[in-house]
Structures are given as structure tokens and as C-alpha cells.
A protein has these predicted regions:
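Active-site-proximal alpha-helix that buttresses catalytic centers in soluble enzyme cores
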Residues: 15, 19-78, 84
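Phosphate-handling substructures
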Residues: 78-141
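Hydrophobic alpha-helical membrane-association signature
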Residues: 43, 141-142
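Basic/polar N-terminal segments that are highly enriched at the extreme N-terminus
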Residues: 1-5
């Protein structure tokens, strides 16, 4: 029996942006933007160092400054442009963006508990409020 050639595989590396001012303060960010802190820039540099020996064909980033800045630091030694897309933004938290994360958690604790009881399919489509994206909506933007 003749062996078929292996299909070409694509390896996808997902990298989170470095720490931002809002991360540091515990503020819900979502699709609002906040600049990287000095620690966030250092995190991006460390990530770049860890990835330095890996060949990339392309680098994608959301259009938010924090993600673009992180991607730009990672690509410094590479001859690649960073391709940005609004579709790669984080989940939108609607009216909760800019508010304290601890208040968000406290306000929705009963819903966090409810999600744990749902099937995987139900959990993916569950919405905390009409203006907060479900997992399904976030994934739908990426694909």
C-alpha cells in the first residue's frame, strides 16, 4: 500500500498582548484600548526572545494599539509587516468597559455560576447581557 503525502499543516501561535494600564488597575477593557505599561513592553520583548527561532510566514494582530504594539515588538527582527484586523479584537464587554473588574465579577457572579451548569453548546452561546459578546460571537468573528 502506498503512503499518501502528509497534508501541509499550519501551526498557529496565539500571543496575548502585554500588560496595559487598565490591566494593572483591574479595569474591564474588552474592545476599549489602553497603552502597554513598561512591564507590558518588557513582556512583549520576552515573548519575542522566546519566539526568535521560530519562522513565521505572517503576523496578525487586532487593530487595537496594545495588540499592535505587542506584535510590532515581536516582529522587530523579522522582515514581516503586521497585518491588522478589527475581527481579531477581544470580546466586547459593552457598557462594562472602563469599569472595575471586581464590580463586573460581583455583579455577574450568579451568571458565572449558571454557565458552569450549562452544556458546552449552551455555554458558548450564553450572553451575560445583550451588549456583551458570547463566546460563539467572538469565535464567529475570528473564523
Amino acid at each position: 500500500m502506498m503512503k499518501q503525502k502528509d497534508e501541509k499543516l499550519c501551526t498557529l501561535y496565539l500571543v496575548r498582548h502585554g500588560e496595559t494600564e487598565w490591566n494593572k488597575k483591574g479595569i474591564v477593557m474588552g474592545q476599549s484600548d489602553s497603552p502597554l505599561t513598561e512591564a507590558g513592553v518588557e513582556q512583549a520583548k520576552t515573548t519575542a526572545q522566546e519566539l526568535k527561532d521560530i519562522h513565521f510566514d505572517v503576523i496578525f494582530s487586532s487593530d487595537l494599539h496594545r495588540a499592535q504594539r505587542t506584535a510590532e515588538i515581536i516582529k522587530l527582527e523579522r522582515q514581516l509587516a503586521v497585518q491588522t484586523s478589527k475581527a481579531l479584537r477581544e470580546r466586547t464587554y459593552g457598557s462594562w468597559e472602563g469599569k472595575m473588574g471586581k464590580d463586573y465579577r460581583k455583579n455577574f457572579q450568579h451568571l458565572f455560576d449558571k454557565v458552569k451548569t450549562l452544556s458546552e453548546k449552551e455555554a458558548k452561546s450564553f450572553k451575560f447581557t445583550d451588549d456583551i459578546e458570547s463566546d460563539e460571537e467572538v469565535i464567529g468573528r475570528f473564523i
